[in-house]
């Protein structure tokens, strides 16, 4: 099941053949040694199977498994990951959710390596993103990096993720209604930078997510793939805008 995700100019495949397709992508780029970054849960969910796919393709890999939950994007975790980035490593592949992806994105960016994102849950719109939120000296700070060079996911793995993670992804998408309205108001009232094409795409994503919502009470693999595709499209809106403003507004604020 190959998904064509609109407005995303990189290879994106959500299918049961994701692992072998990733191996084919690496060979097409002349990459023979990969760093696989995961945590304990995501290693069991898909990291181990991906290692087997890489081995069958005669590709070398080193694996950094971040243990001792919760895994947060702190300086300690970043340093732990960097230790695995030896000179012979030619690309970085994150296998996991938002935090593992953020660390992997930062690692690849600073290490000047290609970055491949392998989501194990349809939980956030940051899989296709330029920002890496890190916790530096106890304060969350978003470091601007670059989007992944490719994205692969297995819908069976997405479906097996905790239901709360899919709910998080759906909530992220429905919240785009608020961020879309905020962005339009900002353009009208304060002359904020604005792109009507991206605005239309974001509104369409929010509407499609609401239509998808009833199916997620008892989702199929296709439903999980559709949810991830919408999250990727939302991320593409931010990449094309060069900032998170289109998809991040008052829906991200807390009232105390």
Language-model region placement:
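Solvent-exposed alpha-helices and their adjacent loops that cap or buttress functional pockets
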Residues: 4-5, 29, 84-87, 108, ...
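Alpha-helix capping and helix-loop boundary segments enriched in small/acidic/polar residues
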Residues: 68-72, 139-140, 161, 245
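A glycine/threonine-rich phosphate-anchoring loop and its flanking beta-alpha core
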Residues: 109-208
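Active-site segments that bind and position negatively charged phosphate/pyrophosphate groups
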Residues: 199-256
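Residues that form or flank phosphate/diphosphate-binding pockets in enzymes
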Residues: 45-46, 102, 161
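Short beta-strand/turn micro-motifs composed of small residues
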Residues: 37-38, 96, 153
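A short, small-residue-rich loop immediately preceding and capping a beta-strand
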Residues: 85-107, 111-120
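ATP/NTP phosphate-donor binding region
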Residues: 1-91
């Amino acid at each position: 099941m190959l998904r064509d995700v609109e407005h995303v100019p990189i290879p994106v495949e959500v299918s049961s053949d994701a692992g072998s397709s990733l191996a084919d992508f690496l060979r097409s780029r002349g990459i023979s040694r990969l760093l696989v970054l995961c945590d304990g849960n995501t290693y069991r969910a898909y990291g181990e199977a991906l290692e087997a796919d890489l081995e069958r393709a005669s590709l070398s890999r080193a694996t950094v498994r971040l243990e001792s939950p919760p895994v947060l994007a702190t300086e300690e975790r970043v340093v732990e990951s960097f230790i695995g980035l030896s000179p012979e490593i030619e690309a970085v592949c994150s296998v996991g959710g938002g935090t593992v992806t953020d660390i992997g994105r930062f690692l690849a960016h600073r290490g000047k390596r290609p970055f491949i994102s392998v989501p194990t849950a349809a939980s956030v719109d940051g899989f296709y993103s330029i920002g890496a939120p890190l916790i530096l000296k106890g304060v969350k700070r978003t470091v601007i990096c670059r989007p992944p060079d490719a994205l692969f996911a297995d819908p069976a793995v997405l479906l097996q993720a905790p239901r709360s993670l899919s709910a998080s992804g759906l909530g992220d998408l429905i919240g785009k209604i608020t961020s879309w309205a905020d962005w339009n108001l900002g353009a009208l009232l304060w002359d904020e930078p604005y792109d009507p094409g991206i605005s239309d795409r974001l509104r369409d994503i929010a509407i499609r997510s609401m239509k998808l919502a009833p199916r997620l009470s008892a989702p199929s693999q296709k439903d999980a793939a559709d949810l991830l595709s919408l999250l990727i499209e939302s991320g593409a809106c931010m990449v094309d805008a060069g900032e998170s403003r289109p998809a991040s507004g008052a829906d991200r604020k807390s009232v105390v």
